[in-house]
From Swiss-Prot:
Function per UniProt: Plant non-specific lipid-transfer proteins transfer phospholipids as well as galactolipids across membranes. May play a role in wax or cutin deposition in the cell walls of expanding epidermal cells and certain secretory tissues.
Keyword Iron-sulfur annotated: no
GO MF: lipid binding
Source domain of life: Eukaryota
Family per record: Belongs to the plant LTP family.
Endpoints of the signal sequence: 1-23
Keywords per UniProt: Disulfide bond, Lipid-binding, Signal, Transport
BP-aspect Gene Ontology terms: lipid transport
InterPro entries: Bifun_inhib/LTP/seed_sf (IPR036312), Bifunc_inhib/LTP/seed_store (IPR016140), Plant_nsLTP (IPR000528)
Protein name: Non-specific lipid-transfer protein 1
Species whose genome carries this gene: Solanum pennellii (Tomato)
Disulfide bonds: C27-C73, C37-C50, C51-C96, C71-C110
The encoding gene: LTP1
PROSITE patterns (UniProt xref): PLANT_LTP (PS00597)
CDD domains: nsLTP1
């Protein structure tokens, strides 16, 4: 019985050591996930797959660091991409029926995101 306990502990230790570490969210993932929103935000097309991308992003942003990264990336994109209707951007959470813990705006203070 003692040998079984030792083997079980060893197996558990191996599982902890080799368990994959969660990857941090990147700006590339944020922009790729929200790319379907661009035509809508620029007034060139329907909402389309935007809500799916938003929901996928919310599912990926599990930590405070991930949410801050997403906020910073969204803020940068809002400043860099010409022709974005900021009112439509701010309305995406409502339209997609999701809760984003900050306003999608170039003026958002991402350091306060939890």
């Amino acid at each position: 019985m003692e040998m079984v306990s030792k083997i079980a502990c060893f197996v558990l230790l191996c599982m902890v050591v080799v368990a994959p570490h969660a990857e941090a969210l990147t700006c590339g993932q944020v922009t790729a996930g929200l790319a379907p929103c661009l035509p809508y935000l620029q007034g060139r097309g329907p909402l389309g797959g935007c809500c799916g991308g938003v929901k996928g992003l919310l599912g990926s942003a599990k930590t405070t660091a991930d949410r801050k990264t997403a906020c910073t990336c969204l803020k940068s994109a809002a400043n860099a991409i010409k022709g974005i209707d900021l009112n439509k951007a701010a309305g995406i959470p409502s339209v997609c029926k999701v809760n984003i813990p900050y306003k999608i705006s170039p003026s958002t203070d991402c350091s306060t995101v939890q």
